[in-house]
């Protein structure tokens, strides 16, 4: 868990927080963002962290806490509207599937020039009994 590498304290400066987040991103293979009611409006660090993940070419898994299985226009930060990312519901089975498959799919789609939000179809959820 990259978030266990360093502690961010309430009195940390913006520069030290970004340095810590950068270190965490340097030690990850997949970027997971939890999409909740307020995620879209957290511009200072959430947007910056997404920008860094995009610059690094990290595969992005967007997890909708509200259970939606697709890109949620109302809650997802707009920076992800056209970025290559898979959007899934907040469920361990589908998140595990995304963690095991999305990195290679992301790389394949990048080579093919594909962008935009992706999602698993109903068959994938049904196969997981969801």
Positions of the model-derived regions?
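Conserved BB-loop
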Residues: 1-21, 36-43
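Active-site donor-binding loop signature of nucleotide-sugar glycosyltransferases
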Residues: 2, 65, 90
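A broadly tuned preference for mixed-charge, low-complexity surface segments
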Residues: 17-31, 80-89
């Amino acid at each position: 868990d990259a978030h266990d590498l360093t502690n961010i304290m309430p009195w940390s400066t913006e520069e030290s927080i970004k340095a810590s987040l950068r270190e965490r991103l340097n030690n990850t293979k997949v970027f997971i963002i939890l999409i909740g009611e307020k995620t879209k409006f957290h511009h200072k660090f959430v947007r910056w962290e997404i920008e860094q993940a995009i610059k690094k070419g990290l595969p992005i898994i967007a997890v909708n806490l509200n259970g939606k299985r697709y890109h949620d226009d109302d809650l997802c930060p707009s920076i992800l509207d056209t970025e290559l990312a898979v959007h899934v519901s907040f469920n361990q089975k589908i998140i595990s599937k995304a963690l095991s498959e999305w990195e290679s799919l992301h790389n394949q789609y990048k080579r093919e020039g594909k962008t935009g939000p992706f999602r698993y179809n109903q068959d994938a959820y049904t196969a997981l009994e969801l």
